[in-house]
Amino acid sequence: MAEAPASPGGGGGSHESGSPRGGGGGGSVREQDRFLPIANISRIMKKAIPANGKIAKDAKETVQECVSEFISFITSEASDKCQREKRKTINGDDLLWAMATLGFEDYIEPLKVYLQKYREMEGDSKLTAKSSDGSIKKDALGHVGASSSAAEGMGQQGAYNQGMGYMQPQYHNGDISNV
C-alpha cells in the first residue's frame, strides 16, 4: 500500500518531516529554515574524507536532510520529557537524556565533558562581564588571576578518523580531542 502524501500541518510525529524537498509536508516552512546551510554540511563532510575526495550534490543534500531529521528526533524526545516535568526550556542535560533514550549511548560521555566545559566557559564569561566592580577574576576552573578563556581546553586537536568516517573522542588531561 502506498503512503499518502502528507497534508500541510497534518499528522505524523513531532519529529517527522514532510517530503524531502518537494514542499509537501512542511506546510509554510521554507527549506532554508528547515535545513542547515549546505556549505556547512559540505565542510563537515569534507573533514571525513581524503583531501582529494569529492562529494556528490545528492550526497550533501541527503546528509543535510538527515541532520535536520536527527535534530528534530532528539529535540522531540527532550521536549516530551520537559512537558512531562512541566518545564518549558530544554537544556543540554535533556538532550543528553534523549540521546541515551534513543540509543546514542556511545556519544553521551564525550558530550557530557563538552557540555561541562561549555558551561564553565559560559559561567566564566558571565563572571568576567559582571565583575567590572574590580573584584578578583577567576577562570572557568576557579584559578585566580588566570586568563578568562577556557577555550584552550575545548579546541579540536586533530581530524576525523579517515577509516571510520566519524569522530572518535579521546581524552587527554580533561581535554576533548579527535583522532
Swiss-Prot record:
Gly residues biased stretches: 8-28
An annotated GO cellular component of this protein is:
CCAAT-binding factor complex
- Keyword Iron present in the record's keywords: the answer is no
The Swiss-Prot or TrEMBL record describes its family as follows:
Belongs to the NFYB/HAP3 subunit family.
Q: Where is this region: Disordered?
A: 1-32, 147-179
InterPro entries per the UniProt record, alphabetical: CBFA_NFYB_domain, Histone-fold, Transc_fact_NFYB/HAP3, Transcrpt_fac_NFYB/HAP3_CS
Q: What is this protein called?
A: Nuclear transcription factor Y subunit B
Q: How is the quaternary structure described?
A: Heterotrimeric transcription factor composed of three components, NF-YA, NF-YB and NF-YC. NF-YB and NF-YC must interact and dimerize for NF-YA association and DNA binding.
Subcellular location(s): the record lists:
Nucleus
Task performed by this protein: Component of the NF-Y/HAP transcription factor complex. The NF-Y complex stimulates the transcription of various genes by recognizing and binding to a CCAAT motif in promoters.
Q: List the stretches of this chain annotated as a DNA-binding region.
A: 36-42
Q: Which UniProt keywords apply?
A: Activator, DNA-binding, Nucleus, Transcription, Transcription regulation
* Keyword field contains Cell inner membrane: no
Region entry Subunit association domain (SAD): which residue ranges?
63-74
Looking up PROSITE patterns in the UniProt record yields:
NFYB_HAP3
List all membrane-crossing ranges: none
Which GO molecular function annotation, any one, does this entry have? DNA-binding transcription activator activity, RNA polymerase II-specific
A single Pfam family it belongs to is CBFD_NFYB_HMF
Superkingdom assignment:
Eukaryota
Record-level GO BP terms: regulation of transcription by RNA polymerase II
